[in-house]
């Protein structure tokens, strides 16, 4: 891929990829590394994607890098809750209700959390989410519905 194309994609999507990677990894430092790896891969490899599908392709690459990173042997186990709490500062002006919704989302298992995040926070269609997570569209729909049902239980005081 040409340098100009990578710069254009970086300008258009780096912030969204960073937010996604922060959310996925739980660490802004890890997210920076993941986003850097995605764009370095674009510079180094002959990359082909369908026109108009750049964003989906980049998020698929980022999701794969995140999974690889979380699986790596050098990755420490456990989650530093204080670090996760600090990461929320990246998301602007959370009011109490938005904060409660986001906290409830963060408490969901990955299988429910990621489809909900990608659909409601990143604006992806079920079809695009299926491609990113490598599951069927019907599985995306089921996971979103089940995740929303689980969140509803935890958010009853706000309803």
How should these model regions be labeled?
Residues 1-19, 23, 113:
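A short, charge-rich alpha-helical start-of-domain segment used by transcription regulators
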Residues 77, 82-106:
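Acidic, proline/glycine-rich intrinsically disordered inter-domain spacer in sigma factors
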Residues 133-157:
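DNA-recognition helix of helix-turn-helix
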């Amino acid at each position: 891929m040409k340098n100009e194309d990578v710069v254009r994609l970086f300008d258009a999507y780096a912030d969204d990829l960073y937010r996604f990677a922060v959310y996925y990894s739980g660490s802004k430092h890890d997210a920076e590394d993941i986003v850097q790896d995605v764009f370095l891969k674009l510079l180094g490899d002959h990359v082909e994607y369908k026109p108009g599908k750049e964003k989906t392709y980049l998020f698929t690459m980022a999701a794969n890098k995140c999974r690889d990173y979380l699986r790596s042997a050098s990755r420490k186990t456990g989650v530093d809750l204080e670090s996760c709490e600090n990461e929320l500062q990246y998301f602007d002006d959370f009011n109490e209700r938005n904060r409660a919704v986001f906290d409830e989302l963060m408490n969901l298992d990955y299988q429910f959390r990621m489809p909900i995040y990608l659909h409601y926070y990143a604006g992806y269609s079920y079809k695009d989410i299926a491609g990113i997570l490598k599951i069927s569209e019907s599985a995306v729909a089921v996971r979103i519905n089940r995740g929303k049902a689980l969140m509803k239980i935890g958010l009853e005081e706000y309803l």
